[in-house]
């Protein structure tokens, strides 16, 4: 069975001291890096996703509700929107960016972009229309199973995993390689993923 690893949103913006920092984010980044170094040969395809917000509309708010609206985070072109240093050092080949001009949680809402440039709305839409999506990339690589890791389990990891399952992939989320915004939201996310047919496991 051909496998892919999706590393979701492991960026300083979601780690301690980031704009939407999650407790344990830096430690998860280091564990993911260790895992990739030990298991890289098992995967036919490895991809990262990033929040890469340019003008995401109401997704950013000065008075966020932390459900549909959020403080400014993942701002394209800033250091905090880049990959976490531990992940950047892995030199992963395929990078997908999402949320440029709207809210986006799932990695399957992203387009492949291996640069850090600021694209126009028209450029983003053109690349979406051209099929430069994560789903198409995985299918082109012959992938049938995906392992999902990253930040945050309760939000973008969950949505990426659920979308992968809906697209017909066998999906595993490694619980020791992700972290939720809160334990309560993590419990709810794990219940939702399990109900959606996603395997929850440890990476070792």
What are these model-derived regions, one by one?
Residues 35-36, 157-166:
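Histidine-anchored nucleotide/phosphate-binding helix
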Residues 1-5:
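Extreme N-terminal starter segment of soluble prokaryotic enzymes
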Residues 30-145:
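Active-site alpha/beta core segments
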Residues 199-204:
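Short acidic-hydrophobic, aromatic-tinged amphipathic segments that line or gate anion-handling sites
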Residues 12, 54, 153, 178-179:
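Short, glycine/acidic-enriched loop or turn micro-motifs at the edges of active sites
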Residues 8, 50, 175:
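Active-site flanking residues adjacent to catalytic metal/cofactor-binding acidic residues
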Residues 15-25:
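Acidic/histidine-rich helix-loop elements
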Residues 172-186:
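Short, flexible loop segments at boundaries between secondary-structure elements
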């Amino acid at each position: 069975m051909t496998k892919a690893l999706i590393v979701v949103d492991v960026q300083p913006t979601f780690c301690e001291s980031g704009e939407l920092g999650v407790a344990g984010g830096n430690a998860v980044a280091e564990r993911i890096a260790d895992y990739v170094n030990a298991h890289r040969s098992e995967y036919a395809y490895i991809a990262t996703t990033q929040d890469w917000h340019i003008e995401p509309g109401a997704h950013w708010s000065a008075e966020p509700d932390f459900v549909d609206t959020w403080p400014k985070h993942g701002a394209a072109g800033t250091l905090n929107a880049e990959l976490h240093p531990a992940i950047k050092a892995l030199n992963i080949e395929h990078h997908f960016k999402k949320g440029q001009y709207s809210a986006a949680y799932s990695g399957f809402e992203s387009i492949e972009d291996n640069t850090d440039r600021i694209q126009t709305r028209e450029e983003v839409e053109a690349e979406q229309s051209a099929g430069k999506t994560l789903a198409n990339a995985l299918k082109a690589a012959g992938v049938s199973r995906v392992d999902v890791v990253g930040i945050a389990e309760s939000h973008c990891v969950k949505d990426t995993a659920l979308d992968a399952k809906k697209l017909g992939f066998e999906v595993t989320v490694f619980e020791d390689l992700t972290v939720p915004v809160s334990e309560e939201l993590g419990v709810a996310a794990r219940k939702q993923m399990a109900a959606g047919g996603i395997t929850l496991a440890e990476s070792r």
